[in-house]
Amino acid sequence: MLANPFTPAFLTQLETLRLRTRKEFLGSHPGNYSSPRRGTSLEFADYRRYSPGDDLRYLDWGIYARTDRLYVKLFREEVDLFAYVFIDASASMGFPSREAKFFPASHVALALSYVILANHDHVKLHLLQDQSRLQDQSRASPFYRGRRRMTDCVSFATAAMPGGTLDLAASLNDHLQRLRRPGKAILISDFLMPAAAYQKGLNLLRSFNLDIAAIQVLARQEVEPVFPNGRLALVDSESQREIAYRWNSNARRDYQARLAHHNLELKSFCHQSGIHYSLYVNDRDLSDFIFATLPAIGLFK
């Protein structure tokens, strides 16, 4: 699964990236992200009046010379980041095959996980799927930290089998009830669901004070379907509902217009909600997506 494109050169390039976050979080170890707590990093935050016992090194003698009052400088504390990567593992992520869609989605998740691990931050992987299909221990990984835990991330993602239906908000809520730390949430899905369904799920993530990115993964066959002209029996991969449909050039244009409108609604909702959004089609080079597109939308520093 990781033979290509996870080459040593690709991993080395991933180590040059760092997630960008729009929020401030409280971490458990010193790290690279701003915290609302006051600390001793080099990023100046504010002043306050001197109190006995304060470190004299942080007295601002310039203010003292002007006001004859003692003030100490305050700095933002830099802390580590907790990142939650949610991967849609419903049946639609297995269309047209697990290798063609779920694997590319997993590759995106694993590339982002490696960036997080290489910065010595914490990452936790979550599978979004019908709860009846998953044991508690297979729904989410533990927190991983450090590059050596990449093999654990790979093992977790490789073991997943897409299947079943997905109620996005309900599945997210099941995971979020166990969440104890705010941080960065990255949701990877095809988002092929009614607008009300993905909006409810994304709003739920927002309610947990998470900085959110939404990455939509589609197969080329979904973007540009190739079917013989004539009558077709189309089967919903999740509900198994079947409909008869007559396919021709007009039907193709109508389908592509509807998909483009759906994707534009998703993108607009994300932008209005302060959520990073990007579309990844499975035949695109992963390296180009990671190193060109994701920095362009502000996901990386």
Q: What are these regions, as identified by a protein language model?
A:
Residues 103, 162-169, 192, 257-260:
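Conserved phosphate-coordination/catalytic loops
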Residues 139-146, 243-248:
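Short amphipathic beta-strand/extended segments with alternating polar/hydrophobic composition
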Residues 107, 111, 166-173, 196, ...:
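Short, contiguous clusters of charged residues that form electrostatic/catalytic patches at enzyme active sites
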